[in-house]
């Protein structure tokens, strides 16, 4: 379990428990997912994100409450609407799962358990802890998820093993505190940052994800990975500039100094008293050293500016 604070989680109240799923042209699978999910929750909510097929009609016939976007707003945009509806309905807990059949609705009780017994505010169905896994998950995708998770964890300090799992559950407390701006898949990381900032307790439970579904992810692995990794690196650079800029800068400065020393040691004195110096290594040392100094100073300045801004916010507004 990853804990942002030792503050106890909210205990169970009287609100409904809802399973919700973004919906975008999933007419082949949404019906079975809704019917399975209904067995474990009080209500199933589908957010139709501009589908052009019969997804919304099928979801309604299977008993789901359907809300629709007039045009596609992206995964994060769909989640924003789901969160808003859940807050309006004052739900006790909200489970998010995919409508394409990748997530097993029978795992819903396992995701809800840590929330309903007060152990967690936010639960992630993880493929990378004992008992979890991905049915024929490509190795390149595993590597990509682990790289993204590493960058995200360096920024949030939560230690989550599967930051990209879309199978998630939220307590009422989490729904009230989590706010996110991204409309794309980056919202998965933004939520974790919000958990760290708002002292919410995060827990992972094992789940198995299928990859042999009719359509699978709406995003290609490359575009998804690049977009989310870019967000993770930007977030990390904002929160830990000394690590992102200062450490590489110091390394480059040391490398430049080493190249420069080798260049000086290779100076040859000719028989006529003149000195021969290989210009190439000297120029390389200068360029590498200047780049290192620039990165190092950038990291130091951003680090100082971040801490100054935090002090000002704390002093004037009480915001940490």
Language-model-derived ranges and their functions:
Residues 65-88, 93, 105-185, 211-228:
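Acceptor/aglycone-binding surface of glycosyltransferases and processive sugar-polymer synthases
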Residues 14-17, 36-45, 54:
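Short loop->beta transition adjacent to catalytic acidic/histidine clusters or analogous donor-positioning motifs
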Residues 1-13, 157, 182-320:
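Hydrophobic helical membrane-anchoring modules
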Residues 48-56, 101:
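A conserved acidic beta->alpha catalytic loop
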Residues 1-36:
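N-proximal low-complexity "stem/linker" segments adjacent to membrane-targeting elements
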Residues 28-32, 53-62:
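Acidic helix N-cap motif at the loop->helix transition within catalytic regions
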Residues 18-22, 45, 68:
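Short hydrophobic beta-strand elements that form part
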């Amino acid at each position: 379990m990853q804990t942002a604070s030792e503050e106890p989680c909210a205990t169970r109240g009287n609100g409904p428990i809802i399973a919700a799923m973004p919906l975008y042209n999933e007419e082949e699978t949404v019906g079975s997912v809704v019917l399975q999910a209904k067995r474990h929750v009080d209500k199933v909510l589908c957010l139709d994100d501009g589908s052009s097929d019969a997804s919304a009609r099928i979801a309604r016939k299977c008993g789901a409450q359907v809300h629709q976007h007039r045009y596609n707003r992206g995964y994060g945009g769909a989640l924003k609407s789901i969160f808003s509806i859940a807050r309006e309905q004052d739900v006790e807990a909200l489970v998010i799962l995919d409508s394409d059949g990748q997530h097993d609705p029978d795992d819903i009780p396992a995701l809800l358990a840590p929330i309903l017994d007060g152990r967690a505010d936010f639960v992630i169905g993880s493929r990378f802890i004992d008992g979890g896994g991905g049915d024929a998950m490509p190795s390149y995708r595993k590597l990509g998820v682990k790289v993204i998770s590493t960058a995200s964890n360096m920024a949030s300090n939560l230690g989550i093993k599967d930051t990209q799992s879309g199978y998630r559950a939220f307590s009422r407390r989490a729904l009230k505190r989590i706010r996110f701006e991204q409309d794309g898949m980056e919202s998965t990381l933004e939520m974790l940052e919000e958990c760290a900032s708002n002292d919410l307790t995060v827990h992972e439970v094992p789940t198995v994800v299928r990859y042999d579904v009719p359509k699978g992810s709406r995003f290609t692995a490359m575009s998804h990975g690049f977009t989310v990794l870019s967000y993770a690196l930007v977030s990390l650079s904002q929160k830990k500039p000394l690590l992102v800029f200062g450490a590489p800068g110091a390394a480059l400065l040391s490398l430049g100094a080493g190249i420069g020393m080798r260049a000086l040691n290779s100076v040859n004195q000719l028989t006529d008293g003149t000195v021969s110096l290989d210009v190439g290594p000297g120029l390389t040392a200068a360029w590498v050293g200047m780049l290192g100094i620039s990165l190092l100073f950038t990291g130091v300045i951003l680090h100082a500016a971040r801490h100054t801004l935090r002090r000002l916010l704390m002093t004037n507004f009480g915001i940490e």
